[in-house]
Amino acid sequence: MADSPRVCVQVQSVYIEAQSSPEDERFVFAYTVTVRNLGRTPVQLLGRYWLITNGNGKETEVQGEGVVGVQPHIQPGGEYQYTSGAVIETPFGTMQGHYEMVDDQGNGFHLDIPVFRLAVPTLIH
């Protein structure tokens, strides 16, 4: 499968303090992903692969069908956005991965998701 310049992805993460418990080494993050179809043909997101790395270098792999229970079709010029979450044992870490995509001709491709940070914000006084 080849990378496709026709589809792009953006990710934004946020620390969820209310669901976290630092004393129990539980740090909860939400991340919002936007997938934009910049091409001329519809595409569908079939599956996902994530590599989650905590601040100690511990890696967790997550893969499965679709995202948040769906395999969205994205029309030309359209986008699909969803929010999900990750729990790690340290106040910082990273995520990266790819989506398994297919166009309307049945051509499969990987949409790479560049590394992004999961980090508890630092308070500045």
UniProtKB/Swiss-Prot annotation:
One GO term of the biological process aspect: error-free translesion synthesis
Highest rank taxon of the organism: Bacteria
A UniProt-annotated Pfam family: DUF525
Cited InterPro entries: ApaG_domain (IPR007474), ApaG_sf (IPR036767), Uncharacterised_ApaG (IPR023065)
Domain ApaG: from-to ranges: 1-125
Extent of the signal sequence: none
Positions of disulphide bridges: none
PANTHER family: F-BOX ONLY PROTEIN 3, POLYMERASE DELTA-INTERACTING PROTEIN 2
Identification of the protein by name: Protein ApaG
Protein's organism: Cronobacter sakazakii (strain ATCC BAA-894) (Enterobacter sakazakii)
Taxon lineage: Bacteria, Pseudomonadati, Pseudomonadota, Gammaproteobacteria, Enterobacterales
Gene designation per UniProt: apaG
